[in-house]
Amino acid sequence: MDFDGKAISSALLEYTGDVAARAMRTDFDLLAQIARTLIEAKERGATIYTAGNGGSAATASHICNDLLKGCRVHNREGFKTECLADSCAVMTCLGNDFSYEEIFSIQLRTKAHRGDVLLVYSGSGNSPSSQFSSNSWA
């Protein structure tokens, strides 16, 4: 396989153009509302739970790290967070013994309290385990 610098440059240019176009469609009012919800949860001592499958699980885990540690950089207490996708043992236990569609909702019914917050990350929005109704856990 030959290295084709022009093809790689072209692909990178197309990719960055796509990222820039998507960034311009960001709903910043919605992001501000989400930030407000997270800050209010922190102020009342609530836990912020995150969930996702595959790459979205990695994103869900990473935001927990950022919320927990990121504030400490500025001499503020971090947020109480937990990623429901971080334990392979728990996820495979629940999936095997009950249903993979319920790997997150079972954890929430056990751990979560009224007023806690759930952030679900999904690239497609189609994963049954990432689809929650307001009554499925709270």
Segments predicted by a language model, with ranges:
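A short, well-structured juxtamembrane/interface segment
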Residues: 24-44
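Hydrophobic packing residues in well-ordered alpha-helices of helical domains and bundles
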Residues: 12, 31-34, 60
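Non-DNA-binding regulatory cores of transcription-related proteins
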Residues: 111-114, 118, 135-137
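Glycine/threonine-rich flexible loop motifs
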Residues: 126-137
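Short, well-ordered, mixed-charge alpha-helical segments that flank or form enzyme active sites
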Residues: 91, 114, 127-129
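Generic N-terminal amphipathic, Lys/Arg-enriched alpha-helix
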Residues: 1-26
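A short, small-residue-rich loop immediately preceding and capping a beta-strand
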Residues: 47-51, 114-125
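Glycine-rich, small/polar surface segments that engage phosphate groups of diverse ligands
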Residues: 40-112
